[in-house]
């Protein structure tokens, strides 16, 4: 028996490898690995279909076409294994070797490898210190290359044209060597001594006079060093032999009708072989040089096309005019090897079908159609049928299953028991797009899905399809159950709040049952217990919504008291675990309350209870929403009576504004802005009154008087409960549709005054179509953009894995509450929840330690911190984590989806990327629901106090204007309101030019006006009184009178002047006609930027605080994540904004210098040290004033910040803070929650590298970009040897750049620019240590995350032997249980890890 098995080849063990190296291959190596030379272009014989000898499919070279059978048929079958047939020369072995045996073609003349020639920067050209053009001229036989100049005036490496060569030849025949073509280049490369060249170049670099020269040398040195370290030889860049791909990988398949389908590679190889053979023949015939040269050029082109078709010249096309797919094209792009076959594979044991709702399922179940289950579980069924003795062979089992006998169904029931399946809905934007369920067999052909998981899948039942996958091995089943079961994914990994929350009908039902109805039956009754209440309700004595009192315990362990509540809420109490206080249920349950209830349940009662609660809430919700019988009818849309009044008022206001404009008091831009504001406000007011009308009903009480009570209007209940619809949409149904946007994004100033109930006129309908169509078009575009952003994020963060428990970092970041305009947007507690404290957090009053250093901040600690009134907390952060590779658990903090400290091996980078990318797509798909109505907040024009107290001015300079108000004269001024004890209650920034309504230290009441300003223009104010004189304000040169077409009035606008010397300005003269002095001694001159509208007129006398000119701000466009998505991409790509503000690098005092070349000079003078000078382009408004004290990092002009400047001036933490805040701003605008730490992970990946400024004694070169840990390692090594360390500066790379410059070339090549990455890797002889996730997936290994982390891979189990030996276990069972044990142990270990 043993002997039989020896005949069959055992499958070779997949080679265990832990790194992969890419390098150039020498011609000898190619020949050594080849199994023979391909000499003929023939493929197969068209009659016999057998491969031609020495052709592209030759059986002698590549192996037999049929298993164990030679080509001529002399030897057949296994018994002749390993014999080489003497007749046809074919070895008798399995035919699968045709997938792995290489052939080769010996070229008659060398050719250059196109990758190293044309992939920029050209490596061959760099190495030879020539330009690419020059190298190409030599290669394509247009010029001679001097290899040895001898005693001639030529020099080595010079190019000679034909004529010049002939001339020189006449004069110095035989004294010099010059050739052309790839031979010339190869000989030149052969003569290079890499070691020597490296030394020479390093010397040249240190002596380089100019920066340009140094850069050029450095570029060349980089390539030389790569050769030096990798052991590659430069002449290998020129090919003398080319390998031929195994034939099975470039198949030739007969189609019916005698035609063949073939891989393009065969055509390309055939071309090479034909030209090569022709060249050989011509050389034998001693053909004229011209013909041979032409043939060599053609051979070069053929080889180029084989490696990378279309890279040089026109692409070679096939018979159907389509470019042939070369070897490079096989790797590149979405359809290439990397992305199509290695990163995304199709798998067996899977099926897909339409989904329908399964409301009676439990949360961990899904309904699987019997037909699908039968097909998916086939092998398991065969196994069980045999085990049960229903049949004896697999074949008979197969028959039984095909006939669908009754036993088969019984077995199927048993097989699927507790065998989880995975459901997936495309697009899978985050990890909750694939979850595991236990299947329940159902009739029909559609998969049933539990309604509560729809949010996570973003699924609905309008025809969506889902795929089912079956985990086979016991380990995969355990992982599926422990990690992916829907019941283990209650919290969202993006923000840590529950994602399994009832929605729509369920919410409506819960809302309906917890509402109060005035004067309902049984109101005011007092019941002795919950049981009595239930009896009374069942008997119909009390209504569901009656207000009653019940004696019950308000929370676990508290004594019973009378609680005022309603019937429905007490019924709901029975559903909710007793641990949860009744206060959480004793409210009207809208969507946010239900979400909060599930969150609290998870924290107090644990996972299992939460799952049960979710299911109970689902059932209760459906039951009561059915009983409520809520529907929609036309009369539910109540149009408020005051609509006409409000509309009239708005029309009057608009007419008034129009009149002001006609009289020339305001500009057209201001008029437009004000009109838009009036209508926006009018729409808001109508919406408000409509909502008030909807939310209150007037009913007659038993006493006979009319009372207003909360309404049971269906539409109002749907929106109020958060089940469906929003105030926005109701506004359009019953209020007014409001302002619409044009496709360009501007707002049309005539609003749609009608609503849908009244119906739209033709014009109104036409205006509406813009928005609706734009919504749909945007959606299509943005989905693609968002997907691409996610892909780049995943790629940059894929190797951010939790690798150690604690890196012992002593650094962290300071967290404060996030405020905007004095309003707290995000509380400090929300921002530090689940993070680790860096140092002890002390109570500011008692000094008691609230949180110890390195302790995780959970909900209870957050409460303590907030109650103590602490303003800022230092926490550990991913940004300051000191782990060399990956991130440590302590710096990362809580795993948001599990609610405890993150486990080792968690792939936090991918989770971060998904959390940021997923809402991007969500949001982009959500624009059109409101139907394109322009949502635009009326601009803030004033500040009101929120608390009573006293006003304090902080850092505020002001002057009194003609009306006696203080006018703010500086930027970053602030007003604070403090209470009697002097504690600050609120603080607001006030803009330059704001008029303050309250004097310092004056008392204010909440709601009183503090300051007001014009939001649409930025004023240029005078600080002192004086007479206005214009300077360089010449009509038609630097200023033009723009006549308004409508009003006929003109205004003076500053324009860009042609001459560089014109500087439009306003000067103030004193009574003696001299230039007045400002309080700080500077002359009173005000420069006017381009676009400013001059308000003052020449020789006018003005008082302090008067407006001299106004700079109009952009008219507002609607905010929408379109602005958002590109903004997020721009931030993560670290792009410089188009018009970025120049920022000061030091603290100091501002002064202005002389102008130069149309730029203005701003000097910043520090208290100690030398002043810095900045040049600001003319026509830009400078936002600082002479004598201002400014801090490092403050902008000197208008514009957005350039992140690279922030990094340079303020350092990494400030940069990270800026990026996190800016990204969050975009998402917050859309109401999307993302935890800061996800953005921090991405920012950490962007800041991984350092740019070398001074190389010291290290192996780095100046301007090299190296990984930070590599930089630190090398420095430690050099300092240890007593050398000088390198000096570097932190570098921020955008996510695309960062992905391409990762250590792993496999990961980079599969991302973008495949050829470029592989070219570079080959020259450097790069080694990929397979540390990230992507490279391991591509190489077909387990990923080094989760249970695949090395710590678990190398773990061994010690099983204690029991004392007495019981009955022996049958062998096969033993294996299975052992496997289960080890997997179970591994998963338990990972769970245990998290707990301690």
Curated annotation (Swiss-Prot):
GO cellular component: DNA-directed RNA polymerase complex
Residue spans of biased composition, Acidic residues class: 1361-1378
InterPro entries: DNA-dir_RpoC_beta_prime, DNA-dir_RpoC_beta_prime_bact, RNA_pol_asu, RNA_pol_N, RNA_pol_Rpb1_1, RNA_pol_Rpb1_3, RNA_pol_Rpb1_3_sf, RNA_pol_Rpb1_4
Residues bound to Zn(2+) 1: 70, 72, 85, 88
UniProt KW keywords: DNA-directed RNA polymerase, Magnesium, Metal-binding, Nucleotidyltransferase, Transcription, Transferase, Zinc
UniProt-listed Enzyme Commission number(s): 2.7.7.6
Positions of region (Disordered): 1361-1396
Top-rank taxon: Bacteria
Cofactor note: Binds 1 Mg(2+) ion per subunit.
Catalytic activity: RNA(n) + a ribonucleoside 5'-triphosphate = RNA(n+1) + diphosphate
Residues that bind Zn(2+) 2: 807, 881, 888, 891
Biased composition range(s): Low complexity: 1379-1389
Alphabetical list of Gene3D superfamilies matching this protein: 1.10.132.30, 1.10.150.390, 1.10.1790.20, 1.10.40.90, 2.40.40.20, 2.40.50.100, RNA polymerase II, clamp domain, RNA polymerase Rpb1, domain 3
Cofactors (names): Mg(2+); Zn(2+)
CDD domains the UniProt entry points to: RNAP_beta'_C (cd02655), RNAP_beta'_N (cd01609)
Keyword Nucleotide-binding: no
One term of GO molecular function: magnesium ion binding
NCBIfam families for the chain: rpoC_TIGR
Entry similarity comment: Belongs to the RNA polymerase beta' chain family.
Quaternary structure, from the entry: The RNAP catalytic core consists of 2 alpha, 1 beta, 1 beta' and 1 omega subunit. When a sigma factor is associated with the core the holoenzyme is formed, which can initiate transcription.
Name of the protein described by the UniProt record: DNA-directed RNA polymerase subunit beta'
Source species of the chain: Syntrophotalea carbinolica (strain DSM 2380 / NBRC 103641 / GraBd1) (Pelobacter carbinolicus)
